[in-house]
Design a protein with these regions (language model features):
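Metallo-beta-lactamase
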Residues: 1-40, 89-96, 102-105
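Cap/insert and terminal regions of metallo-dependent hydrolase folds
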Residues: 52-139
């Protein structure tokens, strides 16, 4: 058994090299697929990114690992979370992105939140508040 880094590199090469011609690299702010914009939010991991999805003039943002808890890290976004690779940078990204989402009233979606994980962010003093909304389905 090797070191964790060595094992990671071995598995990454094994899994990524066969599909390297299909990989799409993107830059911060880039719409890399129609209606999908990448927004850099580093700190949880080096290249952590959240994604804004836009269709028919409506947008929502998929938060990824920006916040791991709908109350704790919303109300205290500057809190350093032990699972972030760079806790200070993660807190900076959290505040920056949540400020933008609240100011622009852009709905959010997160798999870390209770079902359906969809709602809005509002600014409250030094933090934020997540307001859940029921899932809307269009047929």
């Amino acid at each position: 058994m090797g070191s964790p880094l060595k094992d990671f590199v071995i598995h990454a090469r094994k899994n990524l090299l066969p599909v390297r011609d299909k990989l799409v690299f993107y830059k911060d702010g880039q719409e890399f697929l129609p209606g999908i914009q990448a927004l850099a939010a580093p700190g949880h991991t080096v290249g952590h990114t959240i994604f804004m999805v836009t269709s028919d003039g409506k947008s929502f943002t998929f938060l990824g690992d920006l916040t791991h808890h709908q109350i704790l890290l919303m109300e205290h976004p500057r809190m350093e979370f032990s699972y972030d690779t760079d806790p200070k940078q993660a807190a900076e990204s959290r505040v920056k992105m949540l400020d933008m989402l609240a100011a622009n009233k852009i709905p959010v979606m997160s798999y870390h939140y209770p079902w359906p994980g969809y709602g809005h962010v509002v600014k409250t003093g030094e933090g934020f508040h997540y307001i859940p909304e029921p899932m809307q389905m269009l047929l």
